[in-house]
């Protein structure tokens, strides 16, 4: 997946509607059509899980967030245990509804959330409203003692959501009033038989839901009476009154007129004035960055505390009113006050708002920098989530704990490594500068900071983590290591950093059972391949179906990668579970040069797959030249075998081993047999080696000679990678004509002459000192080296070998013309 460095995304957009669908739930296609908009999102599809982590990933993927105006509909199987409601959001377990809703509001813990719950026994969740932010709404659609009826729920959901999505400027608080009648009308269709009677499922918003359902039912059955209609009006008035108490503070000023319209029938005029006048007035005053009305605000402070459960200081902090906050603190306001029932500190609210000035002001008054919310979120965690390096520095300077983990499984370092923005990278570096930081702390799904930093291609953060000795081989919940994360971005630099710190290059993808080397070969990432092989990656590890990296390279037709793998010990004749080997796969794409290279390195030409050999599959796929080449090679091998069978040879000479003794006077290596005194002056000579084997061994001698020469040239001029590879490829082919024993005995002279010729033929640009050379020049160099060292030298035979040769002549009546059969063809 090469990828560009991930840039910082724009600020997340607020969703208008979020639809959470649990397992085994079939959402109505008409409902899904309504959600098919940029400002709406569906998580889960009745098959996949829709738990809080799945929601988090989807929100991050689409760069959206839950806000105070987001309507959240949850359709999931539910159950009631010990008077608590549970949702089935994943295939493996159930989640307590209260905790799930608290996690949903975690992205902005001071804002209300608006939830419709479509679940069996949903009425049990009504009391969970007490644990949510002030102003939150939970609308349940089934009584606590009844199971749900899917089609009717879909009908009610469709009616309810249509207005909310299609109507502009409709806040949750106004939608709440619209829902009173609309949802009750819809739920009259929600019927099923139970114990021989018809059970009507009802919306369980208020204690009056039973009487309300009867009212709606009678109206629909045309059994209206004056008393019934009055009862209906009273119900709506009471709902409006409840609405005023709960949500008056949260109405924006532009909603005031609409709000007054919907509350016009409230009988308690004083209550109406209090809600629509006093609270809105206080909110407006606290929003203005001045202190003209300070005394008036302080006078009514107790009333605000009694009704909202909070203090005016909390309101001014929330509204980022620096001047009024200073005035209240100087007046003696309690800097340790908390915000409502969720027990948020004022410092936490300041961090939520990225209010650096207010946060510093509170820290000067010695507020606790580590005071957590009920979910164990700390101010430092929020500062990291809001991507504010300045806030983080201020908190760390006051000894904020960098290792505190919230109930969401998040720590400051995890959060800063999750986010790819430059601000978050700066925060991560600030945290890593803290001597108490835990670099291997775990986040959701057992992600470590290093894994996350590698996923986000954060090179500086990765380096800082490695300097702090972060675990380079740590695995997440699914078994992936930092090296996998780095490879996902094809990040050569981060991959190199990890390997140099001891990352295991042979880790296996737990899902595909493939190595990173295999993946790199399959995707043609040459730089990563070179790094992995440099750090001793195993080139013969297979995937679940037995495929090796070499097979992947050959199937892609990549000659350069295949040659590199063979040079590093790849098994050329290994087959996968289908019987295919590297040659067979190379023949499928018709790369003649690749096929020739495999043959030169000793691939088995007769090894087949599914009843066919490589030459046959090449012809079948229309690659006549490849097929003809392989057929000629097979014929050549048969001729060699026939000659050998007509001229039976003596037993193959015993294996030679290297003597560690050095003759100082000649500085030559002596080779001896472990059981007899057979000595040869050409240690690598093999009497019976085939043509392809000879070439393979010769390449192993040639390549180091060329590399040594290039290094000498490199001291004077810069030889770039492309030129280096061209020199290697062309000269290797030219020097293959030289007998292997000549190569072995004349290494130093050959290196010196190659170096000299390369320097002479260089067409260097003096301005940039870059080495350049033409293909023709390389071929001419090869001819010169061959002229100097390519003459044929017969092996010098010892007495024992000569004796065997004489016996061979006597028994076969062969002439010297057959001597090459005995010695082996070059």
Curated annotation (Swiss-Prot):
The keyword Repeat applies. Gene3D superfamilies: Ankyrin repeat-containing domain (1.25.40.20). It comes from the Bacteria. The keyword Nucleus does not apply. Keywords: ANK repeat, Repeat. InterPro entries: Ankyrin_rpt (IPR002110), Ankyrin_rpt-contain_sf (IPR036770). ANK repeats lie at residues 308-337, 342-371, 375-404, 445-474, 478-507, 512-541, 545-574, 578-607. This is Putative ankyrin repeat protein RBE_0220. It comes from Rickettsia bellii (strain RML369-C).
């Amino acid at each position: 997946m090469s990828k560009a460095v991930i840039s910082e995304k724009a600020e997340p957009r607020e969703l208008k509607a979020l639809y959470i669908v649990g397992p085994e739930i079939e959402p109505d296609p008409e409902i899904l059509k309504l959600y098919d908009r940029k400002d709406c999102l569906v998580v889960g599809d009745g098959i996949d899980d829709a738990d809080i982590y799945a929601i988090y990933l989807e929100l991050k993927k689409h760069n959206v967030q839950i806000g105070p105006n987001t309507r959240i509909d949850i359709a999931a199987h539910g159950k009631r245990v010990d008077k608590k409601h549970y949702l089935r959001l994943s295939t493996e377990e159930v989640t307590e509804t209260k905790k799930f809703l608290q996690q949903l509001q975690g992205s902005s813990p001071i804002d209300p959330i608006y939830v419709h719950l479509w679940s069996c026994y949903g009425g049990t969740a009504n009391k969970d409203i007490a644990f949510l932010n002030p102003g939150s709404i939970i609308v349940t659609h089934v009584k606590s003692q009844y199971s749900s009826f899917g089609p009717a729920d879909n009908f009610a959901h469709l009616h309810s959501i249509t207005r909310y999505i299609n109507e502009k400027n409709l806040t949750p608080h106004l939608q709440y009033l619209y829902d009173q009648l609309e949802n009750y009308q819809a739920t009259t269709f929600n019927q099923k038989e139970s114990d021989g009677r018809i059970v009507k499922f009802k919306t369980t918003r208020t204690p009056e839901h039973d009487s309300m359902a009867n009212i709606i039912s009678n109206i629909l059955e045309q059994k209206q009476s004056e008393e019934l209609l009055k009862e209906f009006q009273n119900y709506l008035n009471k709902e409006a009154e409840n609405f005023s108490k709960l949500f008056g503070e949260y109405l924006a000023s532009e909603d005031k007129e609409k709000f007054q319209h919907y509350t016009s029938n409230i009988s308690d005029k004083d209550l109406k004035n209090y809600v629509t006048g006093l609270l809105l007035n206080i909110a407006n005053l606290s929003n203005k960055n001045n202190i003209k009305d300070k005394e008036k605000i302080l006078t009514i402070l107790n009333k605000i505390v009694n009704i909202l459960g909070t203090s005016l200081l909390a309101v001014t902090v929330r509204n980022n009113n620096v001047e009024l906050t200073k005035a209240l603190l100087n007046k003696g306001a309690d800097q340790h006050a908390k915000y409502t029932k969720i027990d948020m500190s004022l410092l936490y609210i300041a961090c939520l708002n990225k209010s650096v000035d207010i946060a510093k002001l509170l820290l000067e008054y010695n507020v606790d920098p580590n005071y957590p919310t009920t979910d164990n979120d700390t101010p430092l965690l929020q500062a990291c989530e809001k991507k504010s390096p300045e806030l983080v520095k201020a908190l760390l300077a006051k000894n904020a704990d960098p290792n505190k983990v919230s109930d969401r499984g998040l720590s400051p370092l995890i959060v800063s490594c999750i986010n790819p923005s430059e601000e978050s990278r700066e925060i991560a570096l600030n945290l890593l500068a803290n001597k108490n930081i835990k670099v291997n702390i775990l986040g959701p799904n057992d992600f470590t900071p290093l894994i996350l930093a590698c996923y986000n291609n954060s090179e500086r953060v990765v380096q800082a983590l490695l300097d702090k000795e972060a675990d380079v081989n740590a695995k997440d919940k699914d078994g992936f290591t930092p090296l996998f994360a780095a490879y996902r971005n094809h990040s050569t630099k981060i991959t190199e950093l990890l390997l140099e710190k001891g990352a295991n290059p042979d880790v296996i993808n737990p899902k595909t059972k493939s190595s990173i080397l295999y993946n790199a070969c399959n995707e043609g990432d040459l730089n990563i391949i070179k790094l992995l092989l440099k750090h001793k990656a195993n080139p013969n590890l297979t995937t679940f179906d037995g495929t090796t990296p070499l097979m992947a390279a050959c199937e892609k037709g990549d000659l350069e990668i295949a040659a590199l793998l063979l040079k590093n010990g790849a098994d050329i004749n290994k087959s996968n579970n289908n019987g295919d080997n590297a040659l067979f796969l190379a023949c499928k794409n018709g790369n003649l040069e690749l096929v020739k290279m495999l043959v030169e390195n000793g691939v088995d030409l007769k090894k087949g797959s599914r009843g066919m050999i490589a030459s046959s599959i090449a012809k079948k796929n229309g690659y006549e030249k490849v097929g003809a080449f392989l057929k000629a090679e097979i014929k050549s091998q048969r001729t060699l075998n026939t000659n050998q069978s007509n001229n039976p040879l003596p037993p193959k000479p015993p294996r030679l081993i290297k003597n560690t003794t050095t003759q100082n006077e000649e500085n030559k290596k002596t080779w001896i047999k472990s059981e007899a005194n057979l000595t040869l002056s050409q240690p690598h000579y093999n009497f019976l080696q085939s043509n392809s084997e000879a070439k393979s061994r010769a390449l192993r001698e040639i390549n180091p000679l060329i590399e040594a020469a290039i290094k000498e040239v490199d001291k004077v001029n810069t030889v770039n990678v492309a030129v280096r590879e061209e020199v290697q490829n062309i000269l290797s082919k030219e020097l293959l004509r030289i007998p292997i024993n000549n190569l072995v005995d004349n290494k130093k002279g050959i290196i010196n002459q190659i170096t000299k010729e390369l320097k002479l033929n260089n067409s260097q640009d003096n301005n940039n000192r870059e080495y350049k050379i033409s293909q023709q020049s390389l071929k001419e160099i090869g001819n010169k080296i061959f002229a100097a060292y390519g003459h044929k030298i017969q092996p010098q035979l010892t007495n024992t070998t000569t004796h065997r040769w004489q016996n061979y002549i006597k028994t076969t009546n062969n002439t010297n013309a057959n001597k090459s059969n005995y010695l082996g063809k070059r």
